[in-house]
């Protein structure tokens, strides 16, 4: 069983990495935040549910804030201009072997690996072209 622990969400080679820490595990939903201010935090939630008698369902959500500095009464304060959201629902049959689910995890990591078409489209704010 996975333990709730901190992890590096954004790896910038050690300079300015974003690490999220566990803050909650209520009602089957685990939650991680990058800092104490929810409005300025990177946020990850994950849940696990049985889906029928033969499936397991994982729901993972990610919030990525755009941090800005605002001046209020002459004082500079950090804030969030907007947030980007991602949501992944993953359903796995209960008869999937350890090797099978390892391949699924690696496939998810590969989707967003720098240099792959999906990561390139997101980072260039464009679509997919032949």
UniProtKB/Swiss-Prot annotation:
Q: What InterPro entries does the record tag this protein with? A: Levivir_coat, Phage_RNA-type_capsid
Q: Mind listing the UniProt keywords for this protein, alphabetically? A: Capsid protein, RNA-binding, T=3 icosahedral capsid protein, Translation regulation, Virion
For the keyword Transferase, the answer is no
Q: Per its UniProt record, what SUPFAM superfamilies does this chain match? A: RNA bacteriophage capsid protein
The protein's superkingdom reads: Viruses
Q: Where in the cell is it found?
A: Virion
- Which GO molecular function annotation, any one, does this entry have? structural molecule activity
Matching entries from Pfam families are given as:
Levi_coat
Please report the name of this protein according to its UniProt entry. Capsid protein
């Amino acid at each position: 069983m996975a333990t709730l622990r901190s992890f590096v969400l954004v790896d910038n080679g050690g300079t300015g990495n974003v690490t999220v820490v566990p803050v909650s595990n209520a009602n089957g939903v685990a939650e991680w935040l990058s800092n104490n201010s929810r409005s300025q935090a990177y946020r990850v939630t994950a849940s696990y549910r049985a889906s029928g008698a033969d499936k397991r369902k994982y729901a993972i959500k990610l919030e990525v804030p755009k941090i800005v500095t605002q001046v209020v009464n002459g004082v500079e304060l950090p804030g969030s201009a907007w947030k980007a959201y991602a949501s992944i629902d993953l359903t796995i049959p209960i008869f999937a072997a350890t090797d099978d689910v390892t391949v699924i995890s690696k496939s998810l990591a590969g989707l967003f690996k720098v240099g792959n078409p999906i990561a390139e489209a997101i980072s260039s704010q464009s679509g997919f072209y032949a």
